Amino acid sequence: MTKTQILDCTLRDGGYVNDFQFGKRGIAKIIEQLTLAGVDIIETGFLEDGEYDEEASIYNTVEQISSVLPADHKRSMYVAMACYGEYNLNQLTPYDGTSVDGIRVTFHYNEIEEALEYCRKIQNKGYKVFVQPVGTSSYTDEQLLSLIHKVNEMRPYAFYLVDTLGLMHKDEVLRFFYLINHNLAKGINMGFHSHNNLQLSFSNCQALALVGSDRIISLDSSVYGMGRGAGNLNTELMANYLNEHFDANYEIEPILEVVDEFIVKIKEEHEWGYSVPYYLAAINGCHPNYASYLSNKNTLNVKSISNILRMIEPERRSLFDKKVAEEKYLEYQAHEIDDSAAIEQIRQTIEGKNVLLLAPGASLNENVDKITTLAMQKDCVVISVSFVPNFIDCGFVFLCNLKRYKTSFNPTQKQINLIHTSNIEVEETDKITVNYSSLLNADDAIRDNTSLMLLNLLTKLAPAKVFVAGMDGYVVSNSNYYQERLTMKHDAEQTHRLNDAISKRLEQLSNLLNIEFITPTLYMK
């Protein structure tokens, strides 16, 4: 049987989830617990250029890493990762046994020659080098064999198979393993880094543990599967599997203490794990960040996400490019139309009158009397945002969010006048269609925020005044919305970014519209 090791990458790959902010105490404690558990190799974080923050698992020097390592290393090896081109080796002092033992170097296909020379320089400083090409699973056999021959010349500590897109099945993993194992020089260890987009990390790693080879293989994992997108192989699961089937002697309890003391709290604020968008990214051969970017828009249903992923050119799918994602998103949503007649039709109802804009915030529930009193006044037009309220009749319902329309828009038995943007095909007969792209905001974070798009529309309609209710601002909880079925979750980082961007846009719009909030809000204080 293959000699199997566990390499825990919680502090590095898991760090993408919480921006590496584990805290200095947390970093040291996690490393200590993994050491007590007997984890073979522990990745301490990234080596990068830039300003050092001792609360984050990103370092400028190995001396900074030594400050978070336990005095007794027991049987564990400590490593850090450096992305080629992002860390100046002039900062890397020669190996002296007081800090990390090895450096994992990651690079793209077009960087092979320079990256391998970079690896040699690290090797010459006395460190064990792990050669980790990004997206190995997308290499042709010829490309992979060419790389292996070059790797054999430098004889690093380990060479990695990396399933960046999380799309490999067991038969593909084993085919790559045998190809690499047959051609990689003896004495060089192998490693496998997976992503769990198809829920196959655990089974794929079990298959590798069962193959017959005298080569040591390291399996990357993280505590509780912590990692961006669909996450990674769970350290605790793999350790227990190796204990039960290969007489390994990992201590599981210290790993679970890391879960209990640190990871559960992070999980409450940041999501990771299997989801349909990540599954779609995998089957379309796209980087998982494309899926998360589109999913975080909270405007698309699953079918639309899949359609947009298919629009990305194959050669641009393996590396995430935010510009490409936004370009394809807007291209998909655009549906450019001439809406001049529609604008004039709405203007005839609204020009010179007060508008009561009802956003779906939770404050509507506590302010029903105030809202209904205002709505009953002469020359007041009520427009709700993406929902049909049950306590008041609306002049119009405004809709630009396809996901809202498909999942939570419910006109029940009410007769409604619907204003919708051109990116949505609706079934209602009483509808007015306005051009989607002309109502978009400049900031990516709020590009097609529905309430702001309605306010953008109102700038063309000359209302006397706009009263706003239910535009409360986002908080990290499930209590943002007037009705539970309208709920869309946002993590702490998204919440801050959304609130900041919306506040700035409202300030701009207040120069174009006379806006007054009549319910509590985080905006325009």
Task: Report residues per predicted region.
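Catalytic cores and adjacent flexible loops of soluble metabolic enzymes
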Residues: 1-340
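Metal-ion/cofactor- or nucleotide/acyl-coenzyme-handling active-site neighborhoods
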Residues: 337-525
